Amino acid sequence: MTKKMGLLVMAYGTPYKESDIEPYYTDIRHGKRPSEEELQDLKDRYEFIGGLSPLAGTTDDQADALVSALNKAYADVEFKLYLGLKHISPFIEDAVEQMHNDGITEAITVVLAPHYSSFSVGSYDKRADEEAAKYGIQLTHVKHYYEQPKFIEYWTNKVNETLAQIPEEEHKDTVLVVSAHSLPKGLIEKNNDPYPQELEHTALLIKEQSNIEHIAIGWQSEGNTGTPWLGPDVQDLTRDLYEKHQYKNFIYTPVGFVCEHLEVLYDNDYECKVVCDDIGANYYRPKMPNTHPLFIGAIIDEIKSIF
């Protein structure tokens, strides 16, 4: 008889419509309503990328691709998909409660973030665990997949494809900027999180397996908390690299993210490009993983390694 299990895919979430922006932002700020100025700034950013972020649709597509691939990988298990979001409905708790209502007693959880930190992946897992404990649901968590061969292969291919667009004689004047979402330094140090080291490892593997000669690690999209966050910021890094090495081409791979959304479409494609334009360098940013089979396969391989 086929065993029935849940697949809980967890993600940050994004507003579905403009009226969602205020409650969404309020949830991110732990219930503190944003000022009109902060709210307008966020609305302007969404407007700049063409309205709202494509994140919601892509997250749904990624979750569908994952459950489909997982059901092909396990002949003796039937996985049912549940989507749980951090800052907007359906919330993580709603998804776990629905599992219970459906009679699910065991599930695999995956966060759509390749690198582990207690602030990000750990907080999703904690919320899922707390809700699951109410119903006696057993959860097995995927903690990360930043070094999975297929994940690295995806990014290596993208770097090489981008390099192929650049004249060969300029490859020595090209730098790859590998980045992830910045997090508060104090939290990383307090919890002894492996987050910065995991990003460094991803960058090293891409450098080893691709044709890129120069590589740098940066952080992006930091919050406005008044406390130090991980750095250098990718914009500052771009200027520093240009001043020191006069690179002609900058390739940005925000490997800490898994699809096109506000942080990539605005923070990279607008803010980093503005810096490149200002210094007279060329800006490149390969396509994000989205539902690419190598990306989906990397997560499936990580699940196979723990379940």
Swiss-Prot record:
Q: What class of enzyme is it?
A: lyase
Reaction catalysis annotation: Fe-coproporphyrin III + 2 H(+) = coproporphyrin III + Fe(2+)
Q: Which pathway does this polypeptide act in? A: Porphyrin-containing compound metabolism; protoheme biosynthesis
What keywords are assigned to this protein?
Answer: Cytoplasm, Heme biosynthesis, Iron, Lyase, Metal-binding, Porphyrin biosynthesis
User: GO cellular component annotations, sorted alphabetically?
Assistant: cytoplasm
Q: Where does Fe-coproporphyrin III bind?
A: 12, 29, 45-46, 53, 124
Q: Which residues bind Fe(2+)?
A: 181, 263
Question: What is one Gene Ontology biological process annotated in the Swiss-Prot or TrEMBL record?
Answer: heme biosynthetic process
An example Pfam family from this entry, by short name, is Ferrochelatase
Q: If researchers knock out this gene, what phenotype do they report?
A: Mutant accumulates coproporphyrin III.
Documented EC number(s): 4.99.1.9
Gene Ontology molecular function, alphabetical: ferrochelatase activity; metal ion binding
As recorded in UniProt, coiled-coil segments are none
- Any idea where this protein resides? Cytoplasm
Q: Which InterPro entries match?
A: Ferrochelatase, Ferrochelatase_AS, Ferrochelatase_C, Ferrochelatase_N
Cited function: Involved in coproporphyrin-dependent heme b biosynthesis. Catalyzes the insertion of ferrous iron into coproporphyrin III to form Fe-coproporphyrin III. It can also insert iron into protoporphyrin IX, but it has a much stronger preference for coproprophyrin III as the substrate.
Family of the protein in this entry? Belongs to the ferrochelatase family.
The name on file for this protein is Coproporphyrin III ferrochelatase
- What's the source species for this entry? Staphylococcus aureus (strain NCTC 8325 / PS 47)
